[in-house]
Amino acid sequence: MTVIDEIYSSSSAIPTVALNDEAKMPVLGLGVAKLSDEETESSVLAALEAGCRLIDTAASYGNEAAVGRAIAASGIPREELFVTTKLGTSRQGFHSAQESCKESLDRLGLDYLDLYLIHWPAPKLGKYVESFEGMIEARERGHVRSIGVSNFTEDLLATVIEETDEVPAVNQVELHPRLNQAELRQVHAQHDVTTQSYSPLGVGRLIEEPTVTTIAAEYGRTPAQVLVRWNLQLDNVVVSRSSKPERVAENLDVFDFTLEPEHMEAIEGLHDGTRVLHDPMTFMGT
């Protein structure tokens, strides 16, 4: 199981986790799904200014170029950043996965990706295995350093591992108190796959949940900060999204407090299997 290298209870520094390929990935980053170009640039710049070094985008978001502009404007050395993007469903395939990777690099204005993910498995399409094989080739050519998947179930993950003899470094999935993905996280631990959580606030639905607001008040924190912290304390990597720069910085400020076991358990008790986004087994979009 992946383990957070360092978390200092009195520090705002964002620690890293070691992936199964020995790359180091920040445990908390910014996602830019559904943000306009203007919102993307302002959010990325705010995140970078606040110390964030993990930026997560996707070809289907349509804002890779905006991410690239913000990175360039920040002046932060490339080697200090961890940039993730994702392969769109319409580009799945051995050769098209490699071509799409290079197209994403062109839009981002980068020479390599830190992490490249299959965005959605689209099992009915039947191309996720050959797509992953194409990503292996892209890694061999130096276009990407780590490769992984997103929205993969236990069975789909097992198929990729069995048919390619390659263990994805990361599986990025919807994960929040209503959908804690406990069984999937156990499978990840068995294979040394890092669990990365998106939609940690349940698309905003959980910030008014009484259990969460009560705990937040006790710690003098926002509900969003408590939800992000809960996810981190499960040893997950987290990407959180906001179009408001002040919220971006606020959601990153979660490394100077620790939730007590009883509060972790109370939040865990909210699990009911509710998925607020798409079903990975049937979704054919993006």
Swiss-Prot record:
It comes from the Bacteria. It is an enzyme of class 1 (oxidoreductase). Its EC number is 1.1.1.-. Keywords: NADP, Oxidoreductase. SUPFAM superfamilies: NAD(P)-linked oxidoreductase (SSF51430). Pfam families: Aldo_ket_red. NADPH binds at L201, V203, V239, R241, S242, R247, N251. The active site is at Y61. One of its GO terms (molecular function) is aldo-keto reductase (NADPH) activity. The keyword Cytoplasm does not apply. PROSITE patterns: ALDOKETO_REDUCTASE_2. InterPro entries: AKR (IPR020471), Aldo/ket_reductase_CS (IPR018170), NADP_OxRdtase_dom (IPR023210), NADP_OxRdtase_dom_sf (IPR036812). Belongs to the aldo/keto reductase family. This is Aldo-keto reductase MAV_4483. It comes from Mycobacterium avium (strain 104).
